[in-house]
């Protein structure tokens, strides 16, 4: 019969054995953690390269990712969708929306998108303020209404097309859906980019809109947007400033007018806006200092400091005898001050033009 002392020794012996095996267990556990971490970081990298958020159907992976959100540079910007935090921080609002959509499609391959989401996938200019709740087509799939999704019942399911692996409404249906609901300046950005992307004429665009949308809610305003659309506008910012000129009674400028550099005949400057004024010098308008140039001989421009290049470019344009008026995007937040700036530059503001636009837009 063992004594109490013997029982204690056996117990202590067991503890010693456990202490010996513990480092081995810890090493194996650390190895498994390292392998899991490397695997998940590799998957995040792959998703980033594909322009999507990582969506996982594996519960163990989901638990690992959520444990490491806020560490290891991992973020969960949308439920069940993950990415690197530094990468997400560097994205524009449009890029974030696109990656979110592509991540959602990993979970729901039967989902289809319309409106502003579809416009993004088609490569159209969609202002950030229009990005928010997802625009989903009702195709019999399960849709989380609690997420604030906006549903559309398409006329025919066969009308859907795929863009980058995502089901969307056709190009022109997408444009029309956007114009039927968008504010004027935002809708003009979308309409301009549609004309630019497809190279169709302004008249053909207006005719298509009339055939497809007459009688639909929002058609009158969509028609107003289409009437001012111009495919020469190169980005959404240029379109929104042009919308301001229209709504506030300023003459609509010519777009993307080219001028030869008076000091270098091989270089041609292309300006955003150009007003030919009856009284006084003409005015060149430039947005955000993003000057554009082309070399006639097809050569490469030597790399120079962008600020210095812009100042030189502006001085050369002034040599042509034109005023140069620069706009910054924040100026749209203070339309009264922006209008005063344009008047001081010699661009006439006409009350009758502003009133004409108001009658068109508001119907009175």
Predicted regions and their residues:
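Short gly/ser-rich loop at a beta-strand->alpha-helix junction or flexible surface loop bordering the NTP-binding
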Residues: 1-218, 349-364
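Surface segments flanking catalytic/ligand-binding clefts of nucleic-acid enzymes
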Residues: 11-46, 51-52, 56-60, 195-364
